Amino acid sequence: MTNTLTSTFADLGLSEKRCQLLADIGFEAPTQIQTEAIPLLLSGRDMLAQSQTGTGKTAAFALPLMDRIDPEGDLQALILTPTRELAQQVAEAMKDFSHERRLFILNVYGGQSIERQIRSLERGVQIVVGTPGRVIDLIDRKKLKLETIQWVVLDEADEMLSMGFIDDVKTILRKTPPTRQTACFSATMPREIKELVNQFLNDPALVTVKQTQSTPTRIEQQLYHVPRGWSKAKALQPILEMEDPESAIIFVRTKQTAADLTSRLQEAGHSVDEYHGNLSQSQRERLVHRFRDGKIKLVVATDIAARGLDVNNLSHVVNFDLPDNAETYIHRIGRTGRAGKTGKAIALVEPIDRRLLRSIENRLKQQIEVCTIPNRSQVEAKRIEKLQEQLKEALTGERMASFLPLVRELSDEYDAQAIAAAALQMIYDQSCPHWMKSDWEVPEVDFNKPVLRRGRNAGGGQNKSGGGYQGKPGKPRRSSGGRRPAYSDRQQ
């Protein structure tokens, strides 16, 4: 097994040209999966790798492939992915790792013109990245011929299994030469994946990147209890004002919630868009590019759609709706705090969610820090702080000079400080979101009060959330108005 202390890509056997390219695009040191997988793949071994999303697995198979591909040859490599979004990400990454003008990489998936893909195949490509369904379609049309394939990669094989593509994958593998080199990447190892590996891989090397079920330590987790009578959308507004995320994904359960929440956040002045299954392929691609380029800061997404929304340097993840299990929770928040950076995960919890929250915390073997929703004075102080920073920037700008005559004229009648304060007040009022102009105060949330079960006739709907959290005898009730550390007096 490769020495896990290897610190450079050159030590892994990659070419000098490839290593220089990696340095140019900011890749400093290999991850564990890259350290283990790259030498094996360069040596020609088949490989089975168990690795989670976010560990650098794309580079683990793409880099050795790029070092061995012939840019002037026929079709040599086939990479299968469960979704078109992942196919796009893989293809884009491989182009970043190559910069070889003569090398052609083709994406094939549904939602795009198959005629255009056929024309590209006829012109000649060296690498095909695609979903099993579209690959099968092109094979059946006799437009995609696999006789010259030397390398096959199965990316997220367990996801292809769960989406019903495993038979298509087997059909495709049977049409490739038995001498091919095959690499299979899977986060989990169900029986069907093991059977596929035994059938189609030749004495594969096993690489396992262990990832504990606890949350990554670089991610700060916080939860906010939504006050009774408040909606989660209302609770989220002051939280976003205080956090002011550089980039965030807000997870919701349904497409309708995504649409409603996006509309409400847009009305409040946030740079936000929605990402769900109803969007066309072109709409998805456009949104992903805008998000990666920083043109929008917030994306409201469902879990299924968000598989294609992989963005580096994500500062926040917001669980607007809690997921049904701890694994999904970990996967969601694992999108932030990557590559040695810190991140923050926020969860909104209503009384009906408390049993689900307990199950997540029990699985994680940790309690999530409880915070109170920021009150009006805190939000106003934050907005004034931002206004102060904007003012400092404006004082160094060139456009300020055009306003100096007006200031001198006003100074004849008014105090200079009063003029500045009035101008700032005007700017503050104009930029203040509509929800802040209404009378609102954050109700105190009694964390020790049990969550009562209510029937239809009790006016509470079908709230069957159970007993909630109770404090130890003698514990004082917690006051509101600031952040509190995670507390240990909740019943588990």
Swiss-Prot record:
Record domain Helicase ATP-binding: where: 38-207
Induction and repression of expression: Constitutively expressed; higher levels are found in light-grown cells and lower levels in dark cells unless grown in glucose (at protein level). Transcript level is regulated by the redox state of the plastoquinone pool; transcript accumulates when electrons flow between PSII and cytochrome b6-f complex (reduction of the electron transport chain). LexA-like repressor probably represses its expression at least in part. Induced by cold with maximal RNA induction at 15 degrees Celsius and maximal protein induction at 15-20 degrees Celsius (at protein level).
InterPro entries reported in the protein's UniProt record: DEAD/DEAH_box_helicase_dom, DEAD_box_RNA_helicases, Helicase_ATP-bd, Helicase_C-like, P-loop_NTPase, RNA-helicase_DEAD-box_CS, RNA_helicase_DEAD_Q_motif
Gene Ontology terms, MF aspect: 3'-5' RNA helicase activity; 5'-3' RNA helicase activity; ATP binding; ATP hydrolysis activity; RNA helicase activity; RNA strand annealing activity; RNA strand-exchange activity
Annotated stretches, region: Disordered: 451-492
Keywords (A to Z) from UniProt: ATP-binding, Cell inner membrane, Cell membrane, Cytoplasm, Helicase, Hydrolase, Membrane, Nucleotide-binding, Stress response, Thylakoid
Helicase C-terminal domain span: 234-379
Motif (Q motif): 7-35
CDD domains per UniProt: DEADc, SF2_C_DEAD
Protein activity control: Helicase inhibited by the slowly-hydrolyzing ATP analog ATP-gamma-S. Protein is rapidly degraded upon shifting from 20 to 30 degrees Celsius, the degradation machinery is only transiently present in cells grown at 30 degrees Celsius, is inhibited by commercial protease inhibitors and requires full-length protein expression (the N-terminal fragment does not induce proteolysis although it can be degraded by wild-type extract).
Class in the EC hierarchy, top level: hydrolase
General function of this protein: An ATP-dependent bidirectional RNA helicase with RNA-dependent ATPase activity; does not unwind dsDNA, uses only (d)ATP. Also has ATP-dependent RNA annealing activity; concurrent annealing and helicase activity promote strand-exchange activity. In vitro has low helicase processivity, annealing processivity is probably higher. Required for correct cold adaptation, probably by aiding translation of mRNAs required for photosynthesis and electron transport. Probably regulates the cold-shock-inducible expression of the GroESL chaperones.
Protein name (record): RNA helicase CrhR
